[in-house]
Amino acid sequence: MAISILGAGAWGTAIAISLGSKKDVILWTRNETTFESINGKRESDKLPGCRISDNVSVKLAIEDTINASVTILAVPTQSLRKVCQQLHNCNLKKDVAIILACKGIEKSTLKLPSEIVNEILPNNPIAIFSGPSFAVEVARKLPYSMVLACQNNTLGSKLVSELQQENVKLEFSNDIIGVQICAALKNVFAIACGIVLGSKLGFNAHAALITKSMSEIKALYSAKIGDGSVDINTLLGPACLGDLIMTCTSLNSRNLSFGFKIGNSDNGFNVQQILSEGKSVIEGFSTAESIFNLAGKLKIKMPICEAVYRLLYESASIEDTISVLIS
């Protein structure tokens, strides 16, 4: 089974390194510097020291990716619509399975990644690939656990077999909505946890905040489904609790580090400056706005997410933010 990966950031490249050890992989990038770097050094600047197999061919033209039987989308969520439209314009075949490896909620529409794909490529089957997985550890082929969510059991089982590696424990789920909600929210909570840690409020407050975060995940998850039901296996599995713990406790997390810099700044922080200092997208920044608006649309209270939103977008003080986070 040929596999294309769209997005040559740290995460997309890590997946390419993992799968490329045994499969032919096409890795698409829009960045000519990245293209030349990988082709010249067989290494990405985002993952120094991690060799990219010769089985991975790098392409600049998206039309060179459409003949694979599986397409993995590892682009930022706010760029997903544009990439899907490009695939549509290239006449992507209807039987090509699309695996979403991006996390977030589109700001302009409040749609999940699967809803964006369904809108533009309605005939292509969709799966979600999510869980606790730092790109650098995946690229180094350290052990990790993920969830492959798909509403088609036959396709899901086939994709699990294709993505399974010796160092990966891959669990199957039908819960594509729950898995995506958890994946998006954890980045906002990681920013909140970073603020608490950066403000030196201690691990007790940090642990309490993670615990309260689970309640907000459950609230949005339940409201988004509409019937109040949630899958406890999703909440307590790798895609939710596992990813939340990892993202909210390690400074390898871009979102936690972002929040830490804010909390450690004594109110003298500049959000745009901190964002510009990083080499990668801080998904939680965009997601905070999306979650704030989605919670309003669904008429639910999410005080942690609201506090992070008001700090990032409405210049709320760190003191006012912390009073909510530790209340």
From Swiss-Prot:
GO terms for cellular component: cytosol. The active site is at residue 186. It is an enzyme of class 1 (oxidoreductase). Pathway: Membrane lipid metabolism; glycerophospholipid metabolism. It catalyses: sn-glycerol 3-phosphate + NAD(+) = dihydroxyacetone phosphate + NADH + H(+); sn-glycerol 3-phosphate + NADP(+) = dihydroxyacetone phosphate + NADPH + H(+). It holds the Pfam family NAD_Gly3P_dh_N. GO terms for biological process: carbohydrate metabolic process; glycerol-3-phosphate biosynthetic process; glycerol-3-phosphate catabolic process; glycerophospholipid metabolic process; phospholipid biosynthetic process. Its EC number is 1.1.1.94. It comes from the Bacteria. Keywords: Cytoplasm, Lipid biosynthesis, Lipid metabolism, NAD, NADP, Nucleotide-binding, Oxidoreductase, Phospholipid biosynthesis, Phospholipid metabolism. Sn-glycerol 3-phosphate binds at residues 103, 131, 133, 186, 243, 253-255. GO terms for molecular function: glycerol-3-phosphate dehydrogenase [NAD(P)+] activity; NAD binding. NADPH binds at residues 11, 30, 103, 135, 254, 281, 283. InterPro entries: 6-PGluconate_DH-like_C_sf (IPR008927), 6PGD_dom2 (IPR013328), G3P_DH_NAD-dep (IPR006168), G3P_DH_NAD-dep_C (IPR006109), G3P_DH_NAD-dep_N (IPR011128), NAD(P)-bd_dom_sf (IPR036291). It is found in: Cytoplasm. NCBIfam families: PRK00094.1-2 (NF000940), PRK00094.1-4 (NF000942), PRK14620.1 (NF011213). Belongs to the NAD-dependent glycerol-3-phosphate dehydrogenase family. Catalyzes the reduction of the glycolytic intermediate dihydroxyacetone phosphate (DHAP) to sn-glycerol 3-phosphate (G3P), the key precursor for phospholipid synthesis. This is Glycerol-3-phosphate dehydrogenase [NAD(P)+]. It comes from Wolbachia sp. subsp. Drosophila simulans (strain wRi).
